[in-house]
Regions:
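Active-site-adjacent structural elements in folded domains
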Residues: 156-158
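Right-hand nucleic-acid polymerase module
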Residues: 1-131, 136, 140-154, 179-308
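Short beta-strand-to-loop capping motifs
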Residues: 172-177
């Protein structure tokens, strides 16, 4: 789609370091969105996602992305630079054709794949941020990469090596008790990722490459979820104290001001916290903080939020 469709609305979102181009729909029931949702349904019924991807897949989330690495020692996190805008349409169309005909031939033709890619794009390269089809198509684009990359990691002989991808975030972890070898391992992994990504017209954002050693620190953050080491050596997943503090204060503000949007945000935030920590997240609050909750007639913060 090289000419802007009348159902597409372009917005620009400013972040700390850049301005992102966002393609949204004129309305939730416009023709283009309905077509995109039909395409998503057709593809989802025929596509088997990579076992390594934890993003944009049913019953997988940032929780599963972090949990996969829970008991490893050394972590390397890498980021694909400008991932969605650099996806190659020709390669995507070929991969779409291969994946949709994998279980049963004749599901879709090459021309139909080309048409889908064009209909789900707004330029000659890349997938637009904001289209409902972009996440699924990006996983099709990266499925081959995921398998090949993991195979190359296995050949390095790293103990218990684990690889996951959440959209453009790559996480590699393994066990090791040799600090001297860490930099060599990291250099090799970055070199492999760089060379392999280039085949797909992609590159690493080297500035965002990070590594952590749990034998030195007691926590590491993986796609927004903290893996923390307990005093007894066990590990657990947490969202971090700042998120739980935000939940507490925003929930209390909703008791007096029951603004529907604020209440919805608080309930969504609590759902996120519970999805990661499951139970016991309120143990971080001081007796004074919990006394405030009790003063409203509730035993727990969860009870207070559920009542909003």
């Amino acid at each position: 789609m090289t000419v802007q469709h009348p159902d597409v609305v372009i917005r620009y979102i400013k972040t700390k370091n850049k301005t992102r181009k966002l393609a949204t729909y004129r309305s939730d029931d416009c023709d283009l969105r309905i077509k995109h949702e039909t395409i998503n349904k057709f593809i989802s019924e025929r596509f088997i996602p990579s076992v390594f991807t934890k993003g944009y897949v049913k019953n997988r989330s940032i929780y599963h992305n972090a949990a996969a690495h829970l008991y490893n020692d050394y972590y390397i996190m890498m980021d694909i630079k400008d991932f969605f805008p650099h996806i190659c349409h020709k390669q995507l169309s070929e991969k779409l054709f291969y994946e949709l005909n994998l279980k049963q031939e004749g599901q879709i033709s090459r021309k139909e794949c080309n048409d889908i890619v064009e209909m789900c794009s707004i330029s000659s390269r890349g997938l637009p941020l904001g289209f409902v089809t972009s996440p699924l198509l990006s996983n099709i684009y990266m499925k081959e990469f995921d398998g090949v990359f993991y195979g190359k990691l296995k050949k390095l002989g790293l103990p218990n090596v684990i690889y996951t991808r959440y959209a453009d975030d790559l996480t590699i972890s393994f066990k090791s008790d040799s600090i001297e070898k860490m930099q060599t391992y990291e250099d090799s992994i970055v070199e492999i990722a760089t060379a392999l990504l280039s085949r797909y017209g992609l590159q690493l954002n080297i500035k965002k490459t990070r590594s952590y050693n749990m034998n030195i620190s007691n926590h590491v953050r993986v796609t927004g979820v903290n893996i923390t080491k307990q005093d007894n050596g066990s590990r657990r997943l947490t969202v971090g104290r700042s998120v739980k503090n935000d939940l507490y204060w925003e929930a209390l503000s909703c008791v007096e001001d029951r603004d529907a949007d604020k209440v919805s945000h608080v309930k969504g935030l609590q759902s996120f916290v519970l999805s990661i920590e499951k139970t016991g997240y309120e143990s971080c609050y001081s007796p004074i903080m919990m006394a405030k909750v009790h003063s409203y007639g509730f035993d727990t913060l969860k009870d207070l939020i559920d009542s909003l």
